[in-house]
């Protein structure tokens, strides 16, 4: 066993022990249902990781709860707060600036003082003692959660999709049904953009048609090779004549692409990429967040996914594009660099047949 793997497993088991110990000190009272949905006026949603895709996939929750008169507070990091800052359905943000112990205690006290009617812990995580600290500080609120590591902290543990066979967006329906009972709820993604950002992008695009290529994700397993990028670029030029091809991603990554005179956005902030997606015609991406943004705006999309490392967590299934105009290509291995050239060329051809203007 490699040393890094050993230390990862050691942290895993130490966190499990600490979580279970803390749960006995601050065990939540079990209350299997909300007796009066009309009394739910304030809600905390816990989303304190770096995954923007999670925020997008459950964005319907913000809209649906707001329509019921619920004031939503979102616990997230600075990146998530900036991304959702223009969403008028969210009442306020609590930003987790640090995971330092003293900072976490201060955050926990602040959350406890706000006194929420309901707390939603909608995502599964690896065992985290800091996460259990947050939950233990909210024991006076009704906590609806989906992560089996924290069952003892919840008022109600929801076993939705324990076998991980459904898309994550279906969880929004389960949350709303738990609070309000059976009813018609929309799981359409709900994104909000600043007017000035949209205006700048519309001016930048003009009357041109746009194909976005996002070839280099934040994770190593979501980064195409330069040869793969060249293949995709040439195929797009062939099948999308008279379209502008705009590359998006981190500026420092885009500088490394060995293609002369590629076009990129003149804006660094990610919110401009979101706006560009809204006004684009086609999207090609390895970035799951961008794939879900494209789904929010019903854009024909070619999405490249790594295969899951373990069958127990089929990430390419539960975080799939979730849109009928999307083509999902799953690598035969856990990295997209192993998608072969024939698959790349054929998938671009297939994309060109969807709603082409």
UniProtKB/Swiss-Prot annotation:
Q: What happens when the gene is disrupted?
A: Mutants are sensitive to phage C21.
Recorded protein name is Putative lipopolysaccharide heptosyltransferase 4
Classification of source organism = Bacteria, Pseudomonadati, Pseudomonadota, Gammaproteobacteria, Enterobacterales
- Give EC number(s), comma-separated: 2.4.1.-
What class does this enzyme belong to in the EC scheme? Answer: transferase
What function does the entry list?
Answer: Transferase involved in the biosynthesis of the core oligosaccharide region of lipopolysaccharide (LPS). May catalyze the addition of the terminal heptose (heptose IV) to the outer-core glucose III, the last step of the lipid A-core oligosaccharide biosynthesis.
Query: What organism is recorded for this protein?
Result: Escherichia coli (strain K12)
Query: Which keywords has UniProt assigned to this entry?
Result: Glycosyltransferase, Lipopolysaccharide biosynthesis, Transferase
InterPro entries membership: Glyco_trans_9, LPS_LOS_Heptosyltrfase
